[in-house]
């Protein structure tokens, strides 16, 4: 019916399914049978959905009457179909088709015979062809339709088709579309069916006329099919052209199948016949009446015009996820599964379930359900029930199915059971398939039938399989070598000693016979134990060593005399000479026969290779034990083991290996006995002994005789190394016996010079074995055994240090030169080792041995000579020496230790003792505590001088990524050494300190008291982002006394007094007043805050905030900034060290790379920072004379108003901020609130221009800096002093002072309008800098004109330079967008940003919030309040304010927990101002 419906609705589709049903009618037939049974029941079921229960009952009666007749035929056919799915399905199909379609090409006959099935199904198909098509199987599953459907496309289509072809083609054609549509929707299909029914019924008033019945059945089927999942072609649009389908149907009434015209659906003509039967007028009449009832409901539905209905149906036909889902399952299950899957499962289950469901579901529910739920419900369950409704029909189907199934089951138990389940029980199943039934409905007729067949087939295969098992010949599982020996490839030596081959053969034959009497006759082919045994007996004894399958190991042990051990199998041949062998062979074979188990043991012991290797195969070898030709004969009799094969005693392999030929051990080629060399590889023919040795058979050793002659012994022997070959212990290369050194690594042959263990013994003895000494054989056993190859040579010892296995002669480990555990030789015996090694050649390993007394540096692991007291690489003191060497983690906390450490990479040596600043030079100490604290700000009090070096091992404050540790001053003092490489750690002291901008590691917030301590306590070597915030006044900073050298404290600010931070990347060392001279030898990021001028020197991530001195100038001290109030420190290009002598203001910072030495003493002449790379010279004194000569990023800020005091001579990145507002020199991650010099990522919030501190957000409390600070070439920082700040080539520095003339401030834009733009100065935005000042400056190279700092945080617009974005309306420079902030900073004012990494601006600002910002990594200069942002041009401020990766932005460290995004800067500013 599904196909019928499909056919009606979907025309072609339906037909196709009909064929499917034909193809797979088998199980679908079951469904169809149910359908046939339920022709009435199907109609009733359909009607149940549509028609009241009484109608259903009436139909059930009719169905029972008709169904009984029809169904009986159909049902039996179903069972038959189960047996013959196709046939039966076809019959069913034909019946249905005939009943429905063929007999009554006019709808009436087709339907009437189908009764409900045909009538309802077919009309359902017509009205609901789509449903049935989609439901093909379901329709079929529906009692009538199911039968039609059993031939998925046929039965259903037939019922539907026959009927619907006529009627539907006639009337339902258009309506058929509607039906199909309705079918798709299910309910609507019913409605359409009803309409159609109404139209049809009205047009076909005759109650039982096929049309009326068809309409009814159609509507029913529609309902049922809608309930049942079936392949509804209409769902896929095939049915939608119901006209097409109907036309197809019209073309041939028989071709009701939606897929093809004609009842070919199931059985072709048979289907037509069946339909005629099904199409009994009585059934049809009830169906029609039911249809009328449906029509009534349809009329109720019919309230909608047929046109509306069609539209609705069309819509329903349209694919919708829900409709498709409903249809698709049916399609998948039905069409696809119907032929095959359904055959067994769905159909049976469908029928069973259908029947059950039919009984379960009251007809009234059917009436109720059909309307809204009909499609889904029908498809899933109801449809089936509708089909099944007639109990009689179901019963009939069950009966027939059961009968057929029973017959089937009897014939085919599995299939029968399944089918019975499917057919009889399958009804319940069928209900389940109901859901599946959609699928199964589609394939219902065909698919189910097929399934049954399939199942039957499956059952048969099972039986067949069972049959197969018995058929298998019984073979003794222990396939002994005797059986195999028939094909024994490795009995080459059989003929080796021909003397008793015959005897052995006979013996073997006897053995074989004895073993298995029949085996003699066919032992060759039988792998029966006897053959194997005989072979084994013969073969194994000769090569008892590895070849005995029973107990290879034992045999191996028996090597020389083990033949006895092998005796049961091997012993006869092994023990006995040929004659003995014959006798023994006989005896033994019986044993073997008795003990096929024996062979089993052998087999158990080894694999086929073992068998092949076993003496049985290489019996000649085994016989070699007998040394006499007899030994060969054992080989022969081994063949006899195959005895029927080789009465001659030569096995298949033997014939090849017979004494007439010998196998080359090198290339395994068979050579004639006359050949002395291998014809292929020219390898010399090995004597039997050699062969035996090669074979590894120990028996050969027994008889240095013919036994050895088994050159061609076992098959496995071919693969065995030549006797005497030895494996190099070093490179595992196999060497020839004559080689005394490894051909690969030239390692001496084991045992040559040494009491090498078995290996040598084996080899040498193997050579000796030629003599056939049994003892030597034993030795060889070590070589021979497979596991022995992996055994350590005797006396070998494993180095306890490096676990390398050493030869017995080695007194030291050849690898690590460690002494042999038992040897008394001291470590110095390395010389001894070479001595011993020479014997072995030791591969020249002596060359790699450590010289005596050499020692490895603990820090860098470099090997140093014994006379070296320091590591050549890192100059670390030799362990045990009291040199100044600081361990990787050790930081010299002694005051003397404070001495400068020359380029201590990560080591920051902070010594409380002020006097010895330079005393201990930690040469590039990697692991010194103070070294390389990326984000650590050391907030420890002065108590703990230990600089926090890049301490790998020290746990204190170890590398806390995002932790901000807030410790109180006392604790801080103690904890000074805690901060080790704390990435994001901000150690907050009790004093609230402004968050340090992107302190790579830590921002130290300390109270004033603590500040003092902090300077002492925290010399964070390379504290990347550490900012030391000292609430205390200058004194804390003043604590210069303790010279705190934080080597390369990248981000650390060393608060410790007098600590010199050589290349302390960022540590700022606050030196006590006592020791003004802090040497920041290239303190990379170290900022030493002087109390007033606390200049945070490019503290990479660290911000040092001192509340007292807003003056804090943070020069981008690449490494360390010494903030001494005394200006005396002159870094004279002291690359890593900047010495500040308290007495002398003139402390020269000779090119202190990043170190800024602010001298607090005003009286003293200003420290001259000679090219203090990153140093910022901040002088409190008016003198401010401290001129950082080319202090790279140093911001020289002099607290005194003296405008010119601090000449930042070429301060690379520093911006000079004169007057109190501290210039924040490029403290990398630091933001100096008081000074607006913008650190790298910082935005200067104060009006004062920020020197281009990388990330620093410098918030200048005081914008006006009276003294004109000359910032010579401040790389990144901008001079922030309002007074004319001359920035000499301030690279990124922005000269903030109006008067400031910035000379070539590379990236800096002078903030002060008056400042004539230096090269990179603000006026013309320098390379990356944008002028912080509002006055526009010609864009510097890469700078952003007017406050936009290219690198610095957002600054105000400056004429855009190459890459800069002018914050103002200025046209964007090359890559810049006009209002972009400096490189890392985002300037709030400008919305456009050119590739600002962190800026919020659209330009690829990673984190920066400010819309504008050129390539501002994280800086966000979005805070309007901070005038510094616009004014201060931060050169390359990665993250100014925005928390997003603000390296130094805001005092908030992005990494440091404390850093907050935008507000952070403001907060910092406030905090610093507070301080």
Swiss-Prot record:
Modification after translation is described as: Phosphorylated in interphase, hyperphosphorylated during mitosis. May play a role in the reversible disassembly of the nuclear pore complex during mitosis. Proteolytically degraded after poliovirus (PV) infection; degradation is partial and NCP- and TPR-binding domains withstand degradation.
Report the cofactor remark: Binds at least 4 zinc ions per subunit.
Q: Which residues carry this modification: Phosphoserine?
A: 182, 185, 192, 203, 209, 240, 257, 297, 320, 330, 333-334, 338, 343, 500, 516, 518, 522, 529, 607, 614, 619, 633, 687, 891, 1457, 1461, 1463
Known consequence of changing residue 1415 to A?
Reduces binding to HIV-1 capsid protein p24 (CA)
The record's subcellular locations are: Nucleus; Nucleus membrane; Nucleus, Nuclear pore complex
Q: Can you tell me which residues bind Zn(2+) 2?
A: 728, 731, 742, 745
Q: Where are the sequence repeats?
A: 236-237, 652-653, 715-716, 786-787, 905-906, 926-927, 961-962, 983-984, 1000-1001, 1024-1025, 1084-1085, 1118-1119, 1135-1136, 1173-1174, 1212-1213, 1228-1229, 1240-1241, 1275-1276, 1289-1290, 1291-1292, 1306-1307, 1319-1320, 1327-1328, 1341-1342, 1362-1363, 1374-1375, 1383-1384, 1397-1398, 1417-1418
Annotated spans, Disordered = 1-37, 90-124, 171-225, 1128-1167, 1311-1402, 1420-1475
Q: What residues bear Phosphothreonine in this entry?
A: 102, 369, 388, 588
Binding positions for Zn(2+) 3 per the UniProt entry: 799, 802, 813, 816
Note down the stretches annotated as region 29 X 2 AA repeats of F-G. Answer: 236-1418
N-acetylalanine: modified positions: 2
| PROSITE patterns in the record | ZF_RANBP2_1, ZF_RANBP2_2
Q: Which residues form a coiled coil?
A: none
Biased composition (Low complexity) is annotated at 1147-1157
A GO-annotated cellular component: nucleoplasm
Q: What is this protein's function per UniProt?
A: Component of the nuclear pore complex (NPC), a complex required for the trafficking across the nuclear envelope. Functions as a scaffolding element in the nuclear phase of the NPC essential for normal nucleocytoplasmic transport of proteins and mRNAs. Involved in the quality control and retention of unspliced mRNAs in the nucleus; in association with TPR, regulates the nuclear export of unspliced mRNA species bearing constitutive transport element (CTE) in a NXF1- and KHDRBS1-independent manner. Mediates TPR anchoring to the nuclear membrane at NPC.
Name this polypeptide is given? Nuclear pore complex protein Nup153
This protein's species is: Homo sapiens
Q: Report which gene this protein is encoded by.
A: NUP153
